Amino acid sequence: MTATMQTERHALDVIYERRAVRAYKAEDVSEERLRALLEAAVHAPTAMHHEPWQFVIVQNRALLKRISDRAKEIATAQAAHHGNLLKRPGSAGDGMPSPMADPGFNIFYDAGTLVVICAAPTNDFVVADCWLAAENLMLAARADGLGTCCIGFAVAALNTPEVKAELGIPSAVHAYAPIIVGVPQGDTTLVPRKPPVILKWIRG
């Protein structure tokens, strides 16, 4: 645990303050801070205490750019499937072009670190386990003053044979949860959330 994370903070404060960060400073995240995040990740709940998660950490900007370009190719080819997800954030109309068509757009938002949470698909719960680990990692990052963002559009590219080979991911292992990590450029606006949708509250 880093010095910043040792400061007492209420767990709910960290939960409510976490936001997807899409603008990062150029400075890299140290190995010490990343190891603290990974330690938090592996303390996530896991079905039957299976602990299936494995991690790949990428801090090579040229490689991140190549993966970003490959992910954009795949997303553009599957545009009909992705639908509104390909619109620019906040766009309601059809006239706004997809950022995937912009050669300068980086799906990792120029963050210097990508953490890929992987697992062998040995049971029905490994996907949930990996995303629970991702949430722990993101909350720990927020507590340490770092920003994170889930990059779902990277999943398809990360699971292509050529990218898996470059990242050292075995063929029997699947990349499930790609999370960028970095030092935020300023504060991220807090976005109001919808209230919980309760289908039914059953009491005894």
Predicted features and spans:
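A glycine-rich helix N-cap at a beta->alpha junction
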Residues: 75-87, 166-191
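Small-aliphatic-rich amphipathic alpha-helix that forms the alpha element of a beta-alpha
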Residues: 41, 113-165
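Glycine-rich, charged/polar anion/phosphate-binding loops
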Residues: 39-43, 99-102, 163-166, 184
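Glycine-rich phosphate/pyrophosphate-binding beta-alpha loops
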Residues: 42-50
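Short acidic N-proximal helix/loop "leader" segments that mark the beginning
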Residues: 1-28, 32, 36
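C-terminal helix-cap and adjacent tail motif
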Residues: 2-7, 11, 17, 98, ...
